Amino acid sequence: MKLSVIIPVYNMQDTLERCLGSVLSQLTDDMEVILVDDGSTDGSVSLAEPWLLQYPQLRICRKDNGGLSDARNAGLRLARGQYVTFVDADDEVAPGTYAALMDLLSREEDTDILEFPVQVHYGHSSQHLFCPPSRRWSSARSYWLHTEGWEHTYAWNKVYRRNLFDEVLFPVGKVFEDMYTIPRLLARNPRVRTTQQGLYLYRWNPQGITVGADGEALCQLLQAQMQAAHLMHTHMLSLHGWRFHRSMLCRQLDVYRLTGRILLRWPFVKLICTLHTLCR
């Protein structure tokens, strides 16, 4: 088995057929699709059952509700592919994507993480394309800094060598789980390649955590960014490092405005937060 596609599902009755159809239409004999029902109450996964006879590579795993991270981890435990990738149940994958990516991986066999383009907010007025350069990176840290990896820590526009997850799992109970997970994978110094082939269609979700994040959620995001800065040895005084730290400072200002908490222990941060609040 070459590739396992993991799709967590929780109450996605309106979008699952479209999502699953976009993936199943690309199936080959050396691929499998693992649908993880995370305790849905709307009968979402029953929509997939008619496809079981047509697609023997489709498997359905049912479990009690544990959240997105727990569902992804359940899929990882079942995965048999040399590589794994993820799809959110309200998104889609453009035709021909997996064939192009697996062809590239067959020619670049030492690749551990392959990142591919995303149509961000697909179908919304804010739709825009994220398209990384086609290149092999000298190190995971170089990839992180030069592509500003903190701006696209998406789990689903990447194909991973499965054994990277032997020691890294998604954090159960956390929001912004990708910001916790991707830097931990990169800290294992995998061989990273980016490509302009393939396309993930990331649909705008007005109920998503990134749209309506409260103070506690933003605290978790900032904590994940702080962990990433440590893992990736991101120094404030370097050009690319400063951009990441600027992003962290902006997040700290949001956290202070909503909660009054200061998590960053930098000189003058408290003064900056106070002035920012007074000037609003």
Predicted regions and their residues:
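C-terminal subregions of glycosyltransferases and related glycan-biosynthesis enzymes
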Residues: 154, 203-280
